[in-house]
Amino acid sequence: MDRLYLAGFYTLKFLIFILPSSLRNLLAKFLAFAFMKLKKKRFHVVMTNLNLAFGETKTKEEKLEIAKKCYYNFAKYLGINFILNQNTTKQKILKQVVFKNEHFLLDAMKSGRPIIVTTAHFGQWEIFGLAVAAHFGPSSVLGRKLDSSVMDKILRANRAQFDVELIDKDGGAKDILKALKARRIVGILVDQNTAPKDGIKVQFFGKDVLHTPAASVLAQKTNALIINAFIYQKGENLNEICFEEPIDISTFDKEEAVQKATQMQCSACEEMVRARPEEYFWFHQRFKRFYEKEYKC
């Protein structure tokens, strides 16, 4: 299987580098169309998510249009642009982004407290991590290893050149605490469904979902500040990274702190998704824990 992944990766890489930018966009459209038509179960997940999120507030046609744009962005962001950014430089990455409300992060760094940046599978989140490290300093990202070991090595090598440390969420607690103690910016993607033992119930688009409390628990344990941040398209080849006001969990009632801080993270994600639904990664079964039957084909 690793050989198949590797062959596909290098074939796509060859095509991308020999094609002009206009044809790369056509390639992204083709890949998006093919993925949407061939992976029908995944398309059902996307439409189920859109129905659960927007209900009757959007028409079937509007939801289908969001889905099509989501597939295109997936092909462009995680396919073409991911490959184009292999072995890139900090200067080239920073030319692709502008920062909004960066004073929230800068002031938090000046405070000397640990910092946890939470985000979602939204926009070009791969560039997000590289750009933050390039502009603000070393960071550590909590995540899951890829199923393909060779692709995981490629991903890690790409991030390592920006001093972005990848920490496996399975058994990575000590490494995360070490990173926070060293005052590395710690990034966590917090928008996926979790196993019942790993999540707490919050509201997302007016629906019950499970949400990881990892950032909230770590913040309570280490006195860290939590900053929600998201990346989204600003122009044809430009993205904006927007930071929100820090969440200081130490100011909350201790018994309610984790629940409140986690809901705030989920609400920030919802607000961003409502504003730009086509940039969200709708492929996850976000509502599965409480709406499992809706996902059955």
Feature locations, PLM:
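Generic alpha-helical secondary structure signal
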Residues: R3-L6, K41, V45, I127, ...
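Membrane-anchoring hydrophobic helices of lipid-metabolizing enzymes
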Residues: M1-T119
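Non-catalytic C-terminal accessory region of glycerolipid acyltransferases
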Residues: L38, K68, D107-K110, A134, ...
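Hydrophobic alpha-helical segments typical of transmembrane helices
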Residues: T11, V46, C70, F128, ...
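Catalytic core of membrane glycerolipid acyltransferases/transacylases, capturing the structured
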Residues: S111-D170, N193-G199
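Short, flexible loop segments at the rims of nucleotide/cofactor-binding pockets, characterized by
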Residues: Q91-V97, R144, F162-I167, F205-G206, ...
